[in-house]
């Protein structure tokens, strides 16, 4: 079976060595059964991940406010930002329900991550998209009519490429996903979430 599309990248020896080193460290961490019995540590790490991911996208809530929202406490802050925290917590809590190779699961993750905060929740964008700094164009995403085919090709590559180490594959997917910018909102949050899937 030929792969329809292959993202443009070359695997260097340095990439391979880093991938092996990271994989070994993950295996070592996973071997500590005591960590599996520490739900508070896992929850705190999840809260820190959520806070960092949202802060990158200008969510102004502090780490303690994010923790309070997740703990069901009343927090004074922008309604949309509070909803973003609730959505992100649900999405990160659902990680084990997502199959990283299924496009439908990516759309489902987006619908969770952008619930009540985005008009096109769980749907690819139907408009042009770009990144701007004032009037200066930083990046223009592919046209909206190309998004479904580009995302299909990306997932087909992900499923069919059995030669690229999984860690490198996930990084290439992240890069390509951010380049395609398939959603009207939440691309960075979903890219970071999917890196965990």
Regions found by a protein language model. Name each.
Residues 1-197:
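FIC/Doc superfamily catalytic core
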């Amino acid at each position: 079976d030929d792969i329809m599309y292959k993202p443009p990248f070359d695997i260097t020896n340095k990439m391979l060595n880093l991938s092996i080193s990271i994989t070994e460290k993950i295996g070592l961490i996973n071997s500590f059964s005591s960590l599996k019995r520490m739900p508070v540590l896992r929850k705190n790490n999840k809260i820190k991940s959520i806070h960092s991911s949202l802060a990158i996208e200008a969510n102004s809530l502090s780490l303690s406010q994010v923790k309070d929202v997740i703990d069901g406490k009343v927090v004074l802050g922008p309604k949309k930002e509070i909803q973003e925290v609730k959505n992100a917590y649900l999405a990160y809590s659902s990680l084990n329900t997502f199959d990283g190779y299924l496009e439908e699961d990516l759309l489902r993750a987006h619908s969770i991550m952008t619930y009540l905060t985005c008009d096109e929740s769980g749907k690819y964008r139907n408009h042009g998209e770009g990144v701007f700094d004032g009037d200066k164009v930083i990046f223009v995403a592919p046209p909206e009519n190309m998004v479904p085919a580009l995302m299909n090709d990306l997932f087909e590559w992900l499923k069919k490429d059995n030669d690229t180490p999984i860690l490198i594959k996930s990084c290439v997917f992240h890069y390509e996903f951010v380049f395609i910018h398939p959603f009207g909102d939440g691309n960075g949050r979903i890219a970071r979430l999917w890196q965990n899937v």
